[in-house]
Structures are given as structure tokens and as C-alpha cells.
């Protein structure tokens, strides 16, 4: 009896090298992620050259480990899916070249996957969510509202015009002397903080639509920090905690209000969130409340599938393959690759890869 499709997924768009084996019944047989946090810790952010070299060193090992965990050989697979963009081009190229080599050597079908589609389709993998649904994709390099109508049918309703939220979290952590990655550090510090102590702005809430901006909020945190340092000669731990709590509350409030507008603009039975910042519990709580107001179900992936992983790439590859997609040896690595080809290009570029 047929076991259905089984795909290998390969992900290397930023600072996580990953491989996974996934079946079309939504079973994740293996998911391997080799992070690079230690390599970039001294630089306050991801260094593209260091990331690319690390991907080149780890990709084949991750694939071997994923196959071993799944108890499969390459000959047991039905296809290979690989992130072909958007992202840091050196890492994306490493993954694409490995996938091409494996496809050429085995004769397996090759499917190039948009990294953002991997995040956007994660609710299909984790919960079997039917189309359509509204997706808030919120990560280190990207932030956009998408109506998802199919594996390659996305309508962008709005997005960030400057920094992505994850980038803002990283920069605020750096300003306050907290370790990277900034998201978990800021969230941890905020638990002991008073979000009401500092009057931080809620950017673009006075303008209609679903576009977002976070660079002014980051600058406001910088000003408050500098005022505290000038007044008392440094920052106390409570100062850091209060600044983190205020910043986190501002981000959550902005995203909640813009999500409310997106649901009004494109009503959907399900509101989903994905991307690394979707792991933030304050944000999840705010989005859950917005979904309840609109009579929608709120879904967020398990934390291990919020951040970059190859299981989502394998799944997106399966969906694209079932829709008739095939790629050849001319598959190109793309630093920019908008999900909604009809929408105007987003402004700016995030630290973790080009906006799309």
C-alpha cells in the first residue's frame, strides 16, 4: 500500500541550517536544526559571510542526520524541497546547490520553495487548516499580513515599511546590553518590568490600513535609555526590565490593532501567526484576543516550528508538487522573492534578509 509522498526539506536562508523529512499525511519523520547563535554572538547580529560558510559546512551533515532519524535512504524519498529565497544569498545558494546535486544524482523531483511560503503554510502542516485563512508572518526579516488561498496564492494586505519586529527586538536588546537573539532576551527581561513606566509610541496607528513601522519605536527606546544614563550614570536592572516591557507591549498593541484591521479587510475563519516573533507569549495573547473578537480561531505553531526549520519547507514543497510545480537545474537562488507578485514591493531591507 502506498505511503503517500515523502519529501526531504532543506533550509538555509538565514542563520539556521536545517533538514527535515515530512510525509503528505503531515507526519514529521525528522527535523534537524543546526543554529549559529554562538558564531554571531559577538557581532550583535547575523554576519552573512559567517552564515554562508557555516551553512556550507553543515548542510550535508544535517541531511544525513535527518535521513538517519527518519530511518530512510534517499531512494525512499519522492522529492526534494529547498528554500530558494528570499534570504541571505550565500546561505540560500548553498542550499540550492546541495538540493540540485541530490536531485541530479538520484533523479528525484526538485521543488524550489519560497521561505515565506514555508512559514505561511505551517498551519496546514500542524493543524490541517483549510484555505482560506489570514496569516500574520512576523519574524526577524519580515512582517506582513497575508490572505492565504492556496499553496502559491497569497494576497498581501500590509507589511512593515522599515524594520521588521524581530529586527527591532534584536536592536533593542543590543541597545540595552542584552544577549542575542534579542527576542527571547527582551521577553525574559520584560517579565519583571512595568510596561506603563515609559510612554513609548505606537507607530502608524493614526493612519488607516495595515502597514507597520517599528524603527521609530526603537529610536524612542534609545532616547529613553540615553536619558536614564545621563541622569543616573547608567542603567539599573529595573530600568532594562521596564524598557523591555514597554517596548514589547507597544509591539503587541500595534500588531494587534493592525491585525484587527486586516481581519476587517479580509474576513477569514482562522487567524494564524508564524515566524520567530510568533513565539512571543505576549504577542500570542494579544492576537488570541483579536481573533476572539472577530469570531475567528487563532492558531500558532509549536515554538519549534515558529523559528526557521526545514519541516515547513518540505511541507510547502509537497503542496507545490501536488499543485504541479517542478523545478529543473536552472533553479536560481533569489535574495528577493515576494509572495504576492501583484503587490508593490515592500520598502527597506531587514538585517536577516531582503524584504519580500
UniProtKB/Swiss-Prot annotation:
Entries under HAMAP family matching the protein: TsaD
Function: Required for the formation of a threonylcarbamoyl group on adenosine at position 37 (t(6)A37) in tRNAs that read codons beginning with adenine. Is involved in the transfer of the threonylcarbamoyl moiety of threonylcarbamoyl-AMP (TC-AMP) to the N6 group of A37, together with TsaE and TsaB. TsaD likely plays a direct catalytic role in this reaction.
Keyword Ribonucleoprotein recorded: no
Location within or outside the cell: Cytoplasm
GO annotations of cellular component type: cytoplasm
Stated family: Belongs to the KAE1 / TsaD family.
Cofactor(s) recorded in Swiss-Prot or TrEMBL: Fe(2+)
SUPFAM superfamilies in the record: Actin-like ATPase domain
Primary location: cytoplasm
Pfam families to which the protein is assigned, alphabetical: TsaD (PF00814)
CDD domains named in the record: ASKHA_NBD_TsaD_bac
Catalytic activity: L-threonylcarbamoyladenylate + adenosine(37) in tRNA = N(6)-L-threonylcarbamoyladenosine(37) in tRNA + AMP + H(+)
GO MF: iron ion binding; N(6)-L-threonylcarbamoyladenine synthase activity
Taxonomic path: Bacteria, Pseudomonadati, Pseudomonadota, Alphaproteobacteria, Rhodobacterales
Domain of life of the source: Bacteria
Residues annotated as binding Fe cation: 115, 119, 308
Positions with a binding annotation for substrate: 137-141, 170, 183, 280
Stored InterPro entries: ATPase_NBD, Gcp-like_dom, KAE1/TsaD, TsaD
Alphabetic keyword roster: Acyltransferase, Cytoplasm, Iron, Metal-binding, Transferase, tRNA processing
Record's cofactor remark: Binds 1 Fe(2+) ion per subunit.
Protein name (Swiss-Prot/TrEMBL): tRNA N6-adenosine threonylcarbamoyltransferase
UniProt-listed GO biological process terms: tRNA threonylcarbamoyladenosine modification
UniProt EC number: 2.3.1.234
